[in-house]
Amino acid sequence: MYLPFRFGYRTLAEPVRTMQVLQLPFTRIRAEHAEEILTAAPDEDCLIRSMPVEAPLPRVSRFRGRLRFVPRQYQRHFIDLTTGWDAYQGRFSAKTRASMRRKVRKLAEASGGAVDWRQYDTPEGIQEFHQLAREVSARTYQERLLDAGLPGGKAFVEQLVERAREGRVRGYLLFLQGQPIAYLYCPIDDGILRYAFLGYLQEHADLSPGTVLQWLVLEALFHEERFALFDFSPGEGAHKSLFGKDSRYCADVYLLRPSWRNRALVYSYLAVTDLSRLASDALSRLQLKGRAKRRARAAAAG
């Protein structure tokens, strides 16, 4: 397990630590699991990702003799796929529904009359998906600047193929004039599709490819009536809050032994993140943050 130290867009370090991680979907995690994981692993550091909490937790506190460290807290957005497509659409305003229809129609017109999007879920198909999605991902600023694109290594491809054999993966691609312009990758566990990677080519942003692909995928999933949830993964953002009409407030909770090494790790992390936040706030006050983002994207694209 690693805890990345980031300053703005840059990852400064990723200390790797061995620890016991609770392996449960966030929808099944309860407060008592903190006690249970400590009982099961009394001599190990422990981590509970996306633990639902009723209110924000202090970043550092004590819990059962451990150093409880909470680096991230966020709304985790999701969609209940059992409610039906009509009911889901009804949770959007009439203005938003009309906007979605316009976006789909605009992309269809640019594509010659129909939107060309495809689903991949077989061992052979998922390899084709990966190859084409990597072509898109490699050109996005998220990958070139943030190293946050679809992984390209052999081990990841082998994992995709294994998941496809077990029926536990979906890949989606959106095409324009025969060329991929957007992708969505979703692993599947316990009947839950997880939004893992979404990317699109910035030069086609006027066609809203990421939004259109997400909308069409969700429509198909509702009609398929096979899965329980679409989980937008940890973290927040406009895309997730637009589509994920339900959410739970969650925290990543580290239960660490109170050693000097763990204390140094925690307080170093806090120092870096606080300094990064101060720098971001200063740029915002000076109205330079948007300009800095545009320059960073241009540098990545150049």
Task: State the predicted function of each range.
Residues 31-40, 124-127, 158, 162-166, ...:
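Polar/charged alpha-helical tracts
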Residues 88-89, 144-145, 202-204, 221-223, ...:
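A short, structure-level motif marking secondary-structure boundaries and short turns
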Residues 53, 94-109, 133, 170-175, ...:
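A broadly tuned preference for mixed-charge, low-complexity surface segments
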Residues 1-15, 51-206, 301-302:
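A conserved beta-strand-loop-helix scaffold within acyl/acetyltransferase catalytic domains
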Residues 2-12, 65-84, 228-288, 292-295, ...:
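Active-site/acyl-donor-binding loops of N-acyltransferases
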Residues 4-72, 190-248, 254-255:
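Acyl-donor binding region in acyl/amide transferases
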Residues 28-31, 84, 122, 258-260:
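Intrinsic-disorder/low-complexity, polar/charged segments
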